[in-house]
From Swiss-Prot:
Annotated region described as Disordered, given as residue ranges: 212-397
Description of how the protein assembles with itself and partners: Interacts with POU1F1. At neuronal promoters, interacts with LDB1, in motor neurons LDB1 is displaced by ISL1 and a ternary complex is formed in which ISL1 contacts both LHX3 and LDB1; allosteric structural changes in the DNA binding domain of LHX3, induced by the ISL1-LHX3 interaction, may explain differences in sequence specificity of the different complexes. Interacts with LDB2. May interact with CITED2/MRG1.
Pfam families on file: Homeodomain, LIM
Keywords: Activator, Disease variant, DNA-binding, Dwarfism, Homeobox, LIM domain, Metal-binding, Nucleus, Phosphoprotein, Repeat, Transcription, Transcription regulation, Zinc
Residues with Phosphoserine modification: 71, 234, 238
Residues with the Phosphotyrosine modification: 227
Top-rank taxon: Eukaryota
Protein name: LIM/homeobox protein Lhx3
Subcellular localization(s) per the UniProt record: Nucleus
Pathological condition linked to this protein in its record: Pituitary hormone deficiency, combined, 3: Combined pituitary hormone deficiency is defined as the impaired production of growth hormone and one or more of the other five anterior pituitary hormones. CPHD3 is characterized by a complete deficit in all but one (adrenocorticotropin) anterior pituitary hormone and a rigid cervical spine leading to limited head rotation.
């Protein structure tokens, strides 16, 4: 608040200190500074109070105020002290800035000319200079700022690793078991006991808590992962059981050949197999055998066991298992022979006195003539099949 003092002139007559009248009295004013009657020729008036000319002074510098003063509350100040105390303050030195002084501004901060300088090199910044304004209103020139950033990056990259001894580690673990998140005074006590820095102690507790949390999470993940694996295995086991049952049904169904034509139907239309009137057992697969039993191009493949076709044959073998009773469909009229050497083909023998037998080619091997007049069996065949393949039609029975 700006107040201007006025000089009041006492116009009372000389020698008359007070004039008493019937209607009232006129008193001599008292000084607000010294609390005495003002008998001077001139009286100063400020803040609606009267002052001696020597009593009206600045509250800070005690300079007598004769023409103009500034007040705040019950105190009176000169112009300089008033702006120093209540005016705009410099962001660097925190002192008031008079309104007549030249200043510099950086965003919302105001500086004295001599305070507008770099805090590192103390160089006063001029108009056009590049600088960085810190959060605490300090100024740093561009060169010093970039140098400080480079040093900080190098120090961060070359930061030495802290080594904790076994005794220090035992002390920290004991404190962690007591409280995983200790208070500040506990960390200070641990720092003094172990000789480690406060920051090191704080980081150790943070890392320890993070490790415990990670271990708990991993344990839960393993537990749930094992549970889901067991569930998947159980579901896979039940599915495999169903598949095995289905495969068993398919395997049983593959034994019968309801859609396969008989050899009589497959043979030539000359009535060669028409004299075979007695049906034989159907082709069957031994229990537990793997793979499918197929009949292709009139040939019988696979190392299976069948009945002997004629008495006195040197190739007699035990009878094959009976075919399933529940399988429908026509049964083939011809059985086959099996030999230790699976590479040999199969040739059925005809009835005595009948036409010469036809050659039946196996699905996966060469043809062979099994109806020879030899009584010794396999040693009578030549070493090479090519030498006897063409002699099958001229074999003697």
């Amino acid at each position: 608040m700006l107040l201007e003092t006025g000089l009041e002139r006492d116009r009372a007559r000389p020698g008359a200190a007070a004039v008493c009248t019937l209607g009232g009295t006129r008193e001599i004013p008292l000084c607000a500074g010294c609390d005495q009657h003002i008998l001077d020729r001139f009286i100063l008036k400020a803040l609606d109070r009267h002052w001696h000319s020597k009593c009206l002074k600045c509250s800070d510098c005690h300079t007598p105020l004769a023409e103009r003063c500034f007040s705040r509350g019950e105190s009176v100040y000169c112009k300089d002290d008033f702006f120093k105390r209540f005016g705009t303050k410099c962001a660097a030195c925190q002192l008031g800035i008079p309104p007549t002084q030249v200043v510099r501004r950086a965003q919302d901060f105001v500086y004295h000319l001599h305070c507008f300088a770099c805090v590192v090199c103390k160089r006063q910044l001029a108009t056009g200079d590049e600088f960085y304004l810190m959060e605490d209103s300090r100024l740093v020139c561009k060169a010093d700022y970039e140098t400080a950033k480079q040093r900080e990056a190098e120090a961060t990259a070359k930061r030495p690793r802290t080594t904790i001894t076994a005794k220090q580690l035992e002390t920290l673990k004991s404190a962690y078991n007591t409280s995983p998140k200790p208070a500040r005074h506990v960390r200070e006590q641990l720092s003094s006991e172990t000789g480690l820095d406060m920051r090191v102690v704080q980081v150790w507790f943070q890392n320890r808590r993070a490790k415990e949390k990670r271990l708990k999470k991993d344990a839960g993940r393993q537990r749930w992962g094992q549970y889901f694996r067991n569930m998947k295995r159980s579901r896979g086991g039940s599915k495999s059981d169903k598949d095995s049952v289905q495969e068993g049904q398919d395997s049983d169904a593959e034994v019968s050949f309801p859609d396969e034509p008989s050899l009589a139907e497959m043979g030539p239309a000359n009535g060669l197999y028409g004299s075979l009137g007695e049906p034989t057992q159907a082709l069957g697969r031994p229990s537990g055998a793997l793979g499918n039993f197929s009949l292709e191009h009139g040939g019988l493949a696979g190392p299976e066991q069948y009945r002997e076709l004629r008495p006195g044959s040197p190739y007699g073998v035990p009878p094959s298992p009976a075919a399933p009773q529940s399988l429908p469909g026509p049964q083939p009229l011809l059985s086959s022979l099996v030999y230790p050497d699976t590479s040999l083909g199969l040739v059925p023998s005809g009835a005595p006195g009948g036409p010469p037998p036809m050659r039946v080619l196996a699905g996966n091997g060469p043809s062979s003539d099994l109806s020879t007049g030899s009584s010794g069996g396999y040693p009578d065949f030549p070493a090479s099949p090519a030498s006897w393949l063409d002699e099958v039609d001229h074999a003697q029975f």
